[in-house]
Amino acid sequence: MGSAESREGRRASFGMDEEERVRVLQGIRLSENVVNRMKEPGQPSRVGLLAPPAAALGPSGGREKDSKPPRPDCGSGRGPPRVQVDPLERCDWEQAVLQDELVRVATTEREAAASPRSVTLRRGEGGVDQEKQRLAQRARELESQEEELRCRDAFYKEQLGRLERQNLEAYRLSSQQFHEAATKIEGAIKPRRVEPVCSGLQAQILRCYRDRLQEVLLCADLVRAYQHCVSSAHKG
């Protein structure tokens, strides 16, 4: 379980519970005792000589005779003899290391996942501030445009009133001048008395025609006298 062959031949798979604790390792759910031991810092590893179990020697004792004890390398100067770690302790140690690595990876992932949100929030706040500034600037521009329109409206109203007053004054002056000129011309023209020409002869001719309807030729002398009178009036 803790040997190099086991580590190279099997891959560790893990799962985390709601408290972010590793509970599954290589398909095996960890117990509370193992988790507690993984949490304890600085736990000394129990190292001792690993004696082969009695079952591994077999029923016959011939192998004990053939097997030779290992010779210590006293003269080599390479240090103390090699010791073998208890597989259970080695498994616990590997699980503790794996637990620390998983916690570190989970923490790193949480920080990496949280940093874009914080950056996005800061960017969002900056965007909101920029939008507020843009709206405030637009409001000031609209207020300035409205003020300019009010000034122009007042100016045009004043100019229109001035033009109306000028036109009214010009109309009154023109009307007064017209009446004065008409009165002056009427005074300069002399009236003439018109009387009908040869009115007496005209009345006699009309009476003659009424009295002598059947003898109108008898009125010829009066007609000639009326024509002579009219011709004289034209000449005179």
Curated annotation (Swiss-Prot):
<keyword id="KW-0449">Lipoprotein</keyword>
<keyword id="KW-0519">Myristate</keyword>
<feature type="modified residue" description="Phosphoserine">
    <location>
        <position position="31"/>
    </location>
</feature>
<feature type="lipid moiety-binding region" description="N-myristoyl glycine">
    <location>
        <position position="2"/>
    </location>
</feature>
<keyword id="KW-0175">Coiled coil</keyword>
<keyword id="KW-1015">Disulfide bond</keyword>
<comment type="subunit">
    <text>Component of the mitochondrial contact site and cristae organizing system (MICOS) complex, composed of at least MICOS10/MIC10, CHCHD3/MIC19, CHCHD6/MIC25, APOOL/MIC27, IMMT/MIC60, APOO/MIC23/MIC26 and MICOS13/MIC13. This complex was also known under the names MINOS or MitOS complex. The MICOS complex associates with mitochondrial outer membrane proteins SAMM50, MTX1 and MTX2 (together described as components of the mitochondrial outer membrane sorting assembly machinery (SAM) complex) and DNAJC11, mitochondrial inner membrane protein TMEM11 and with HSPA9.</text>
</comment>
<dbReference type="GO" id="GO:0005739">
    <property type="term" value="C:mitochondrion"/>
</dbReference>
<keyword id="KW-0496">Mitochondrion</keyword>
<comment type="similarity">
    <text>Belongs to the MICOS complex subunit Mic19 family. Metazoan Mic25 subfamily.</text>
</comment>
<feature type="compositionally biased region" description="Basic and acidic residues">
    <location>
        <begin position="1"/>
        <end position="11"/>
    </location>
</feature>
<dbReference type="GO" id="GO:0005743">
    <property type="term" value="C:mitochondrial inner membrane"/>
</dbReference>
<dbReference type="Pfam" id="PF05300">
    <property type="entry name" value="MIC19_MIC25"/>
</dbReference>
<comment type="function">
    <text>Component of the MICOS complex, a large protein complex of the mitochondrial inner membrane that plays crucial roles in the maintenance of crista junctions, inner membrane architecture, and formation of contact sites to the outer membrane.</text>
</comment>
<protein>
    <recommendedName>
        <fullName>MICOS complex subunit MIC25</fullName>
    </recommendedName>
</protein>
<dbReference type="GO" id="GO:0042407">
    <property type="term" value="P:cristae formation"/>
</dbReference>
<feature type="disulfide bond">
    <location>
        <begin position="208"/>
        <end position="219"/>
    </location>
</feature>
<feature type="disulfide bond">
    <location>
        <begin position="198"/>
        <end position="229"/>
    </location>
</feature>
<feature type="domain" description="CHCH">
    <location>
        <begin position="195"/>
        <end position="236"/>
    </location>
</feature>
<dbReference type="GO" id="GO:0006974">
    <property type="term" value="P:DNA damage response"/>
</dbReference>
<keyword id="KW-0999">Mitochondrion inner membrane</keyword>
<feature type="modified residue" description="Phosphoserine">
    <location>
        <position position="13"/>
    </location>
</feature>
<feature type="region of interest" description="Disordered">
    <location>
        <begin position="1"/>
        <end position="22"/>
    </location>
</feature>
<dbReference type="InterPro" id="IPR042860">
    <property type="entry name" value="MIC25"/>
</dbReference>
<feature type="short sequence motif" description="Cx9C motif 2">
    <location>
        <begin position="219"/>
        <end position="229"/>
    </location>
</feature>
<feature type="compositionally biased region" description="Basic and acidic residues">
    <location>
        <begin position="122"/>
        <end position="132"/>
    </location>
</feature>
<feature type="region of interest" description="Disordered">
    <location>
        <begin position="109"/>
        <end position="132"/>
    </location>
</feature>
<feature type="short sequence motif" description="Cx9C motif 1">
    <location>
        <begin position="198"/>
        <end position="208"/>
    </location>
</feature>
<feature type="compositionally biased region" description="Low complexity">
    <location>
        <begin position="48"/>
        <end position="58"/>
    </location>
</feature>
<dbReference type="InterPro" id="IPR007964">
    <property type="entry name" value="MIC19/MIC25"/>
</dbReference>
<feature type="coiled-coil region">
    <location>
        <begin position="127"/>
        <end position="167"/>
    </location>
</feature>
<keyword id="KW-0472">Membrane</keyword>
<feature type="compositionally biased region" description="Basic and acidic residues">
    <location>
        <begin position="62"/>
        <end position="71"/>
    </location>
</feature>
<keyword id="KW-0597">Phosphoprotein</keyword>
<dbReference type="GO" id="GO:0061617">
    <property type="term" value="C:MICOS complex"/>
</dbReference>
<feature type="region of interest" description="Disordered">
    <location>
        <begin position="34"/>
        <end position="86"/>
    </location>
</feature>
